[in-house]
From Swiss-Prot:
Residues 1-24 form the signal peptide. It is found in: Membrane. Belongs to the amphiregulin family. This is Amphiregulin. Glycans are attached at residues 30, 103, 236. InterPro entries: EGF-like_dom.
Length: 243
């Protein structure tokens, strides 16, 4: 009695191991039945009929599960697109990744959405230029010029001061003394006027002297001529009287 019970237990155990192996192989190889093992013939003893009956009964649920599992996975793999790939190892298969195609409805919805304006457009550049071209006289150099107006030259990027009247310097902090200039100018004018008057007086005196000398010479000649005529007349009168 012990030998048939031991053989029955061994056969059931072997069937369970074979069924689990077949199920795992079916999951890995996508429903291909490779290496299915048939149950061993076992012992041709008197208890062989009982073993075969028990094996058929125990095989039914495992076989149905295997068939349903193979059918489900085969349908799933049939529905999937055929993607080219390469096998690194017997147990690992590397396949390429393909981006899923967008539906037409999604594309239409995306096209219907209003286009947003880019921030880096003309408006953005204008704002940047405005920020760059901000006048530093209004903020940083507000109190730079003491007695003048701050002016920013964009081409040279230099801040200068336009000084008020009578002020000069980098920050218009120095003032010119008008009183000293007036005194100097008055003195110079007085000196110039005096020189002009002196020169004019000298010139007038010289002209007067020259004219006086010329007139004297002229009158002296005329006087001498008149005197000579008078003498000649007197001499002629005396001569006629003697004769």
């Amino acid at each position: 009695m012990r030998t048939p019970s031991l053989s029955l237990a061994l056969s059931v155990l072997s069937l369970l191991v074979l069924g689990s192996g077949h199920y795992a192989a079916g999951l890995e190889l996508n429903g291909t039945s490779s290496g299915k093992g048939e149950p061993s013939s076992g012992d041709h003893s008197a208890g062989g009929l009982v073993v075969s009956e028990v094996s058929t009964i125990s095989e039914m649920p495992s076989g149905s599960e295997l068939s349903t599992g193979d059918y489900d996975y085969s349908e799933e793999y049939d529905n999937e697109p055929q993607i080219s790939g390469y096998i690194v190892d017997d147990s690992v298969r590397v396949e390429q990744v393909i981006k899923p195609k967008e539906n037409k409805t999604e594309g239409e919805k995306s096209s219907e959405k209003p286009k947003r304006k880019k921030k880096g457009g003309k408006g953005g550049k204008g704002r940047r230029n405005r920020k760059k071209k901000k006048n530093p006289c209004a903020a940083k150099f507000q109190n730079f010029c003491i007695h003048g107006e701050c002016r920013y030259i964009e081409n040279l990027e230099v801040v200068t001061c336009h000084c008020h009247q009578d002020y000069f310097g980098e920050r218009c902090g120095e003032k010119t003394m008008k009183t000293q200039k007036k005194d100097d100018s008055d003195l110079s004018k007085i000196a110039l006027a005096a020189i002009i008057v002196f020169v004019s007086a000298v010139s007038v005196a010289a002209i007067g002297i020259i004219t006086a000398v010329l007139l004297r010479k002229r009158f002296f000649r005329e006087y001498e001529e008149a005197e000579e005529r008078r003498r000649l007349r007197q001499e002629n009168g005396t001569a006629h009287a003697i004769a």
